[in-house]
């Protein structure tokens, strides 16, 4: 342990016997033995603690390696690599859907314009109110009111009546009736030559 040989141990024992004496040497050896035992125990405990620390460090290292191995899962790395590709695919799909929706709307607009709206034949819940005509005034009363409202015209002198008669007689003379258009006579047929018998008869009649 201390790299001491037999000769060195004998020298130490002789020195102790001379210094301590033969009476006090046995209890001193016992105390020395107890001290060595305690030192061994302390060394053993220190060694045990050191070993436990090493084991814990190794376990920590092992745990770290295990956690690193779990983190280095190829599935998760592949998923992370595929995420941008999925996003690009989703964007392309969204653009295609928008384009198809726009074309469908364009095709639906003319078809909707061509289709005539169907008239609604629903009847009203309440019947329409027909306005009642106001009672017309009686014709006799109306005539009486008009007669009462019109003032009587003053009588004209008789001289004016005579002038009117003369004017009525002179009017047709001044404005003669328009001549009637002559009727167009049809083309006369040429007269047949008179026979001597007819000429004789005419002379006799004359």
UniProtKB/Swiss-Prot annotation:
One of its GO terms (cellular component) is TAT protein transport complex. Residues 125-138 have a biased composition (Pro residues). It holds the Pfam family TatA_B_E. The chain crosses the membrane at residues 1-21. Residues 110-124, 139-151, 187-196 have a biased composition (Low complexity). Part of the twin-arginine translocation (Tat) system that transports large folded proteins containing a characteristic twin-arginine motif in their signal peptide across membranes. Together with TatC, TatB is part of a receptor directly interacting with Tat signal peptides. TatB may form an oligomeric binding site that transiently accommodates folded Tat precursor proteins before their translocation. This is Sec-independent protein translocase protein TatB. It comes from Rhizobium etli (strain ATCC 51251 / DSM 11541 / JCM 21823 / NBRC 15573 / CFN 42). The gene is tatB.
